[in-house]
Amino acid sequence: HKPNLAHEQAKWIKAQNTDELKRIAQRATFLQLENLLKSAVKNNNVSDNAELYLNLIESLKDYPLQMDATTTYIDARIKSVSKNTPSEEVKALKHEIEQVIAQNPTHFLRNRWEQGIFTLLINADDTEGLVHYAQRVKPSSLEMQIAVLNAELQLERTKNETNKKQNSNSDSNIISRYEQLWLANSKLPNDAQLWAKWYSDGKRTQDKIYQKAEELFAQNDANGMALLSSELNKIDSAKEDEMVLANLKRFESLLKNPATLPELADRLPLIEENNKIVTKFAVVQTFPRYLRTLSETMKEPNFAPYQQWAKNWQLTDAQIREWEIAFLGRFFDNENPNFQQWRDAEILKLKADNLTERRLRMAIWQKTDLTPWLNALSIEGQQKQEWRYWQAKTIAKRDSKKTKEILTALSNERGFYPMLAATKLHPKTRGNGYDFGQPELLIAPSISDPYWADEFKKVNPALEEIAELRQLERFGPAKQRWRFLLENLSGDAKKEKQMALSQYANQQNWFDLGVDGSIIAKAFDYIQLRLPIAYSHYYDIALKSRPALSKSKPQAALNTNVSKSFAMAISRQESAWNPQAQSSANARGLMQLLPSTAKATADNAKLPYAGEADLFKPLNNILLGTAHLAELNAKYPNNRILIASAYNAGAHRVEKWLARANGKLEMDEFVASIPFYETRGYVQNVLTYDFYYQILQEKEDPQTFSNEEYDRLY
């Protein structure tokens, strides 16, 4: 009997459709259940419809987020508990949560369940239960930690009253633990009883006040300092020591306005009997902030007055060194010849790599000898790819053999400078043979390999949860579970498992999670894993399209000269393939466009743009991002170094850097002397990623650098 293949295929398709329809229905139920429970909590009637909620949860059998639904119901019931709730109900709910934990001991939600029991016991005002529970589970939030300490103090007081004791060792231990929280936090919730007990026990000493002030100062917490200085206002008869209060006010003032430092530092400090200067930390820590209030172009920067401060305030040699490094960093580019001479002498003396590297970059764009600065680097600094490259270039004329040796070794590594080394070794072909030390691409193990079958079975429920959360566009929670999954894999070959799962993520088009997984696995040599071919068809469409051209900028919207590998390299560097990425400057989406840039580009290229939300949509973002790259390509034809610099830092800054270079710098010199650390690294990464993407896209004769990049003077 031969199987009817068409019949079997039809059955399979029908089953798939049935499963998909069931999933859609369950998804709708899940979302409606969440809304019902939200309303029930608001109306304080969760318990009135328990059967309804349980039936809805039961209907979610085999739905990946059924456990989330159960958790939402548990949370709603916890919120409904008060001190008037019968203790039997509280115990029953606690037991129910503990059963869920026992049945799912390794689930991502375990911590939420465990912490939920704290909230349950706090809401129920179950002092004894709270203390006992805290002995085996650690409370995570400050609010819960304080609640536990309050409960312990209450039990201890009851016990002492029964035994007619004044204090006990347990009492002292509670207050000691409270003190650690007080020292580490500017404000604590619901700590009135603990604070009063701690204060009445004489624990709020001047040493403790200054210890906390120093911590607040390090955190730049002016509000916390204000709270500390007014802390005794809560006690009618108490008054802060005048000197302490004056110092706390001074610390607050310094945090708000570092320019006032001389008012404190110019005075001779008060040295206490133990030879301690209690306000010293404020002077030490404010100095770098104070320097930022001074003009970098002041007539003649002079460190001598600050050396006098350092002497008066008894700074250690290490602290003076940090001050001098900060001073040099602030005025580094000052044009005063006396300062420059002193700066160079001090850099050679201090041997601080951050200053030495900055001086090296200055020497590169000024085209002066690098040797003294290369020699001043630490051993670690000299081993960086960048400085090995410049060492080779510096000695090229006098020792070609050594130069070739350095460049050859460098060309067997990954990165921008290895790629540059390969180009130097083979200038005619632009280093076309560069293979970053990997003649063959390292392929990550696949989770679908039979070898991983048991592991896949174990993690599949978590992967299904992640898939469903992403379907619901809950990308943040999905990423949290992804990281939890990868970081908590058990057994041997953890890195291989992490890589296999990252490969799986890329296969599911979870490109941001695939990249994230490759970082967690430290799979730096696995280029295919680190640089997935993401949203490939969108880039094809965007780069083939020719939007209407602006009359004022006839070339502005032409995408034809922007390569797919370059556009993808920019995206990978900008967002690590996270469509929801948002920077502190409000750049958004895959290609991290500012709304203002997006609007201007859309107007110029005649592209649709409805507002900021569009930038979180991959296709919209790619259309606008590639159009903006095309605008920059029109300005800097086929020069990815200038395009990438402008994309990151703005074209106005690129023009400024080109004006400084004045047509005298070679490509490597221009890149090394880009003043912004972020932009310098950005350009190097983008060009390297572009080369890798050309290989991954199987481009014939992948190009390291174009003629426009390599042959011109900048």
Tell where the protein language model's regions lie, with residue ranges.
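Alpha-helical adaptor scaffolds
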Residues: I74-D75, E114-T119, E324-D333, W342-I379
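Extracellular/periplasmic ectodomains of large secreted or surface enzymes and adhesion receptors
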Residues: L410-P418, A422-E465, L529, I533-Y538, ...
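N-terminal leader/linker segments that initiate helical-solenoid repeat arrays
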Residues: H1-T72, K79-S82, E88-K91, Y434-A462, ...
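Catalytic glycan-binding domains that act on GlcNAc-containing polysaccharides
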Residues: A304, Q308, N312, L348, ...
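Alpha-helical repeat scaffolds
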Residues: V46-I57, N84-Q103, T127-V137, K159-L183, ...
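Hydrophobic/aromatic side-chain positions at a characteristic register within alpha-helices
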Residues: A25, L37-N45, K61, I78, ...
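Conserved small-residue packing positions in alpha-helical repeats and bundles
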Residues: L33, I74, F118, L149-L153, ...
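Generic helix N-cap/helix-start motif at coil->alpha-helix transitions
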Residues: L21-L31, N49, D62-T70, A92-L93, ...
